């Protein structure tokens, strides 16, 4: 089978896109169409994957390159590149990631008689709503990030596509509530590959400083307001009074990083909160390995109530106990697997309680074992890879019939 996979950002790199492509190339020929904001070669063949990038212009043209690659269904550069790739490769199936280019994929798929599978890694309308909640109204947001328009696009897309991949049970339930036939929705969760829980050779660490009585918590991901990092910082201030060795290590970057750094300065927590910035994924994983507890403090918004962060399973796969907010998917998994503690979203006092409950090493080790076992038995990419391959076979077969 020949598959055209559409991804609206640069590649490399995205952990889910990489896992999906690595799995698909084991049995199929895969052509990935992606953005080219980093001005890479238009075509590249790597790890058995055909990578087709959008055209780009020189840096002297400023932000024109961003306009060329803007992921809108009517962008002629996307339409042409996707159309050309599908025609030349003679693709049998289109797999499109998230909503921005779903209509493009569906339109081309209908014209060429090719089935379209939609990978809904995000609740896109709710994610944009979270962005508005912090940034407020602006003309730009109204024109290109309008939740009402995006919800309309979503409702049409989920009805027209041949099959949908959902990342968690709560997302599947939401899609069914929108009128999607349950038979057209399959779970492919953001689980780690088996390599994640195999102990690799250590490289001497990546800069996490700790003392003999330290308790190190790690947050891995984008630095945005709805991810609850402010709550985590305020909780560290409370815990520090009883446990001076507590430390929060933050790995990542994002639009609200400056706000969080300012808060750390205002609370005089420079010795208790460490920002490592964006790290290569292998180095970020090593930071988790050097830490004691994994943290997922996301606000329980509609977005985080219907999606699941990769980092939860990364923490669990390496035997780290987790502290999560009461966003529905993370709360459900942590309670079912008994691999950590749940706190009330946006409640720094309750998060401080959860941190202190993991002060004992024996408690952390027991919860860490439960999380690791859950990944080994259920929440791993071997399981989800089988589901992914099955779905694409079904989609291709249904259109032929």
For each predicted feature, which ranges?
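Conserved donor-binding/catalytic core segment of Leloir-type glycosyltransferases
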Residues: 4, 209-227, 232-236
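A short, well-ordered alpha-helix in the C-terminal region of glycosyltransferases
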Residues: 350, 363-378
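Short hydrophobic beta-strand element within catalytic cores of glycosyltransferases
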Residues: 293-296, 314-324
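N-terminal subdomain of nucleotide-sugar transferases
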Residues: 1-52, 163, 169, 193, ...
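Donor nucleotide-sugar binding/catalytic pocket of nucleotide-sugar-dependent glycosyltransferases
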Residues: 34, 52-54, 125, 144-203, ...
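Membrane-proximal helix-turn-helix segments that form the acceptor-binding/catalytic region
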Residues: 77-87, 103, 107-111, 123-127, ...
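Conserved acidic donor-binding segment of nucleotide-sugar-dependent glycosyltransferases
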Residues: 336-337, 341-348, 357-362
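Nucleotide-activated donor-binding/catalytic signature segment of Leloir-type glycosyltransferases, i.e.
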Residues: 251, 258-286
């Amino acid at each position: 089978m020949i598959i055209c996979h559409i991804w609206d950002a640069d590649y490399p790199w995205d952990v889910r896109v990489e896992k999906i492509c690595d799995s698909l190339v084991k049995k199929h020929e895969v052509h990935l169409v992606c953005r080219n904001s980093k001005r890479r070669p238009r075509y590249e063949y790597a790890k058995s994957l055909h990578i087709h990038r959008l055209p780009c212009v020189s840096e002297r043209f400023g932000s024109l390159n961003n306009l060329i690659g803007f992921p809108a269904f009517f962008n002629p550069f996307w339409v042409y590149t996707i159309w050309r790739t599908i025609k030349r490769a003679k693709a049998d199936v289109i797999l499109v990631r998230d909503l921005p280019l779903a209509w493009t994929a569906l339109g081309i798929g209908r014209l060429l008689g090719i089935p379209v599978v939609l990978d809904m890694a995000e609740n896109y309308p709710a994610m944009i709503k979270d962005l508005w909640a912090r940034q407020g109204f602006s003309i730009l947001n109204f024109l290109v990030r309008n939740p009402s328009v995006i919800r309309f696009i979503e409702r049409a897309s989920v009805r027209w596509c041949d099959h949908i991949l959902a990342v968690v049970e709560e997302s599947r339930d939401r899609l069914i509530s929108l009128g999607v036939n349950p038979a057209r929705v399959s779970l492919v969760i953001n689980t780690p590959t088996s390599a994640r829980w195999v102990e690799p050779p250590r490289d001497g660490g990546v800069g996490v400083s700790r003392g003999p009585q330290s308790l190190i918590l790690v947050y891995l991901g984008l630095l945005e307001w709805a991810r609850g990092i402010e709550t985590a910082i305020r909780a560290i201030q409370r815990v520090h009074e009883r446990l001076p060795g507590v430390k929060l290590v933050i790995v990542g970057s994002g639009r609200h990083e400056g706000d969080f750094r300012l808060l750390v300065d205002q609370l005089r927590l420079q010795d208790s909160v460490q920002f490592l910035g964006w790290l290569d994924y292998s180095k970020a994983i090593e930071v988790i390995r050097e830490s004691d507890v994994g943290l997922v403090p996301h606000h329980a918004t509609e977005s985080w109530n219907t999606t699941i962060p990769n980092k939860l399973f990364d923490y669990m796969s390496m035997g780290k106990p987790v502290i999560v907010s009461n966003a529905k998917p993370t709360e459900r998994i942590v309670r079912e697997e008994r691999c950590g503690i749940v706190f009330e979203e946006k409640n720094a006092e309750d998060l401080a309680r959860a941190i202190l409950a993991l002060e004992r090493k024996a408690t952390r080790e027991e919860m860490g074992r439960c999380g690791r076992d859950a990944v080994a038995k259920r929440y791993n990419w071997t399981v989800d890879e089988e589901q992914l391959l099955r779905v694409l076979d079904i989609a291709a077969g249904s259109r032929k019939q």
